């Protein structure tokens, strides 16, 4: 497109610029129409549309999205409230069932307890019978071993001694009997001879005595000698030893006595055990059955209602805050945008003067005027390079990444992420209130557990009372007999010792064997009996039974453990279903809503990030393309580069010059090299751009001739020198 001359307008209904200008202005470009009207927007018109700047609109769109999210969250919370109240009713019903569990479980537990007691008592009976029989036979065996051993010992000692003594006495008696008779015979013979002589002597004496009237007695020893001849040791001299030998005790009486006395208490115990425990049956009616429980914690409890009301108030407060903040931000965004618009307007006015100057690339001038900020950013970034080609490539890459379409994508992605941030803040505020609901529901669970604990404790106390009474009864009626039997057995052992001692005393009392036999008895039997009595005393002291008592938390332990703070698995709670994320169904409803909103925010964040990455991709495309050409050198005409720029200055009679607004060079034009920018504005000399036909034309047009143009005669501002020695022009900035 070319600026037409003043006499011919391309829009018939609109007068051309300078239509009212005097003839003295012919040959010069008039920047403003005489009446001040322009077809483009002035500063005030531009400022009138500041309120619809992109950031205000984006903030308003973010506000709309946040309000939609808040409304959706309120609707979801309303649904969650209804579901929570329904779940509360379910929890209440389930809690009542849980609290009534002792009523149903106690029957089975009572039967289990009674069966366990009956089985234990039956086993106790068998154990007692076997134990009593075993102890009975063991005691009898030990006592029999003891006294039979003792009997063998002193029978050997006593009978051996008696046999020796009786033999000695018999030999002595036979020797004395035979010797005394022979002595008597010999004495009788001697005495008979002596008596005959003596009698003869007496006869002589008697004859003389008769003269005097008397007589002398005669000597007669026959009777005495006859007695001496018939003298023998009495046969009763060994009758005592024979009697002692024949009267040695065999302890048959002791054995019979001991058998009778020892077996009696054992047999009595067996009889009593059979009578008492033969068909033992536990009285199940003594075990209690707790009553049913009916819990009411949903009616009259505003915990759930207050929670959701608080959440609703929180959402409404958040909506008001977002409305106030975002609207204020949208309004405040108009201030910098207005200032930016003013600066843009001033920059456009300043840079519009470049159009009237001789420019190497009019399209660059149009770009700088129409996009002052992005062009300024490109110029500032390009100023770091001294090579004109690289400066142009840097500016081109920035221009590629900051096109209106690219900036729209960038702003859309940023606005989406900001919207997600606002929604996240709203969701985070709601999430912080969830523990309050968990506390309310935890109170429900505590009520259920308290009911269970009370019912379980009452049942356990009553059941333990029955078990304790049974323990006392068994200890008195069964183990009381054991204690009695051990006492009787100790008494029997004492009687056994006394009876044995009496027999020994009767048999060997007053003899030299008594003391040794008593010492042997004490060593062999007395010490063993004392040991048995010590064992029986221990049995007497420890013979009792204690059945284990039922714990108070029999029915409540599992429920209490499921809601304990150290339970890491939330689904273990009796208020939750398997696989739930929380410990109760009421909180699960709220968590489900939060997860739904969170998933939506996550999806929007992903979409916004994808849009932002799309802009990054666009920017990378420009950067990669610029880098591709960055290290390529300028091509000369012989290598396919463009022809040197020439000028062909023409002017019509009206004093207007055709200023080409295309970036395509015209190598056939006859134009002089572009002069430096001058401070005064007099004329505009331009070259008509006619496309060239070369193999790089299409590529150059796509890239804006980046790296393919001849910038040796690039524009300089008002003839100021370039500090880096670059032929590249920096518009609006002078280098000093």
UniProtKB/Swiss-Prot annotation:
GO terms for cellular component: mating projection tip; plasma membrane. One of its GO terms (biological process) is plasma membrane fusion involved in cytogamy. It is found in: Cell membrane. The keyword Plastid does not apply. Coiled coil: none annotated. It comes from the Eukaryota. The chain crosses the membrane at residues 55-75, 138-158, 321-341, 398-418, 604-624. It is a multi-pass membrane protein. Residues 1-54, 159-320, 419-603 are extracellular. Involved in cell fusion during mating by stabilizing the plasma membrane fusion event. This is Plasma membrane fusion protein prm1.
């Amino acid at each position: 497109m070319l600026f037409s001359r003043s006499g011919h307008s391309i829009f018939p209904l609109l007068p051309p610029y300078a239509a009212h200008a005097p003839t003295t202005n012919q040959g010069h470009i008039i920047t403003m129409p005489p009446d001040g009207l322009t077809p483009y927007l002035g500063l005030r018109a531009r400022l009138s549309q500041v309120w619809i700047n992109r950031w205000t609109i984006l903030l308003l769109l973010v506000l709309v999205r946040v309000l939609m999210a808040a409304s959706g969250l309120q609707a979801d919370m309303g649904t969650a409230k209804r579901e929570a109240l329904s779940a509360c009713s379910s929890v209440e019903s389930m809690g009542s069932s849980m609290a009534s569990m002792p009523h149903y479980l106690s029957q089975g537990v009572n039967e289990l307890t009674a069966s366990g007691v009956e089985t234990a008592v039956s086993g106790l009976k068998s154990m007692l019978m076997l134990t009593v029989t075993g102890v009975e036979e063991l005691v009898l065996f030990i006592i029999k071993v003891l006294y039979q051993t003792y009997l063998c010992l002193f029978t050997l000692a006593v009978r051996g001694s008696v046999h020796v003594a009786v033999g000695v006495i018999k030999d002595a008696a036979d020797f004395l009997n035979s010797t005394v008779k022979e002595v008597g015979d010999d004495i009788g013979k001697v005495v008979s001879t002596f008596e005959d002589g003596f009698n003869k002597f007496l006869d002589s004496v008697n004859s003389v005595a008769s003269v005097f009237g008397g007589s002398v007695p005669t000597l007669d020893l026959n009777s005495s000698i006859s007695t001496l001849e018939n003298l023998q040791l009495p046969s009763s001299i060994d009758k005592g030893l024979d009697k002692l030998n024949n009267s040695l005790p065999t302890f048959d009486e002791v054995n019979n006595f001991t058998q009778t006395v020892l077996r009696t208490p054992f047999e009595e115990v067996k009889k009593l055990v059979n009578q008492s425990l033969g068909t033992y049956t536990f009285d199940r009616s003594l075990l209690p059955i707790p009553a049913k429980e009916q819990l009411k914690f949903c009616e009259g409890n505003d915990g759930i209602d207050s929670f959701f009301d608080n959440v609703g108030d929180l959402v409404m407060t958040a909506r008001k805050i977002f409305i106030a903040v975002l609207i204020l931000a949208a309004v405040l965004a108009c201030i910098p945008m207005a200032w930016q618009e003013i600066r843009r307007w001033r920059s456009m006015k300043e840079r519009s003067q470049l159009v009237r100057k001789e420019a190497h690339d009019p399209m660059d001038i149009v770009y700088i005027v129409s996009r002052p900020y992005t062009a300024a950013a490109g110029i500032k970034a390009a100023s770091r390079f001294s090579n004109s080609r690289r400066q142009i490539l840097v500016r081109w890459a920035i221009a590629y990444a900051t096109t209106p379409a690219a900036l729209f994508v960038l702003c859309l992605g940023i606005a989406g992420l900001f919207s997600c941030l606002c929604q996240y803040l709203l969701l985070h505020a709601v999430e912080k209130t969830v523990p309050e609901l968990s506390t309310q529901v935890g109170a429900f669970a505590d009520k259920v557990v308290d009911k269970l604990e009370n019912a379980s404790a009452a049942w356990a106390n009553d059941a333990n009372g029955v078990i304790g009474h049974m323990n006392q009864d068994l200890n008195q009626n069964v183990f009381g007999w054991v204690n009695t039997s051990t006492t009787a057995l100790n008494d029997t052992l004492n009687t056994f010792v006394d009876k044995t001692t009496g027999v020994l005393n009767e048999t060997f009392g007053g003899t030299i064997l008594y003391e040794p036999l008593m010492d042997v008895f004490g060593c062999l039997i007395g010490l063993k009996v004392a040991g048995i009595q010590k064992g029986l005393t221990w049995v007497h002291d420890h013979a009792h039974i204690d059945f284990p008592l039922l714990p108070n938390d029999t029915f409540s332990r599992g429920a209490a453990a499921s809601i304990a703070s150290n339970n890491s698995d939330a689904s273990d709670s009796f208020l939750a279903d398997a696989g739930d994320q929380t410990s109760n169904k009421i909180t699960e409803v709220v968590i489900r809503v939060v997860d739904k909103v969170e998933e939506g925010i996550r999806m929007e964040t992903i979409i916004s990030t994808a849009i932002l990455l799309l802009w990054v991709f666009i920017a990378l495309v420009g950067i990669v393309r610029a880098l591709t050409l960055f290290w390529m050198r300028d091509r000369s005409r012989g290598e396919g580069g463009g022809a040197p720029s020439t000028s062909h200055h023409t002017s019509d009679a009206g004093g207007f010059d055709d200023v080409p607004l295309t970036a395509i060079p015209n190598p056939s034009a006859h134009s002089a090299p572009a002069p430096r920018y001058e401070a005064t504005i007099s004329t505009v000399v331009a070259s008509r751009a006619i496309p060239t036909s070369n193999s790089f034309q299409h590529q150059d047009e796509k890239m804006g001739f980046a790296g393919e143009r001849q910038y040796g005669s690039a524009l300089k501002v008002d003839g100021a020198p370039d500090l880096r020695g670059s032929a590249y022009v920096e518009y609006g900035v002078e280098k000093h």
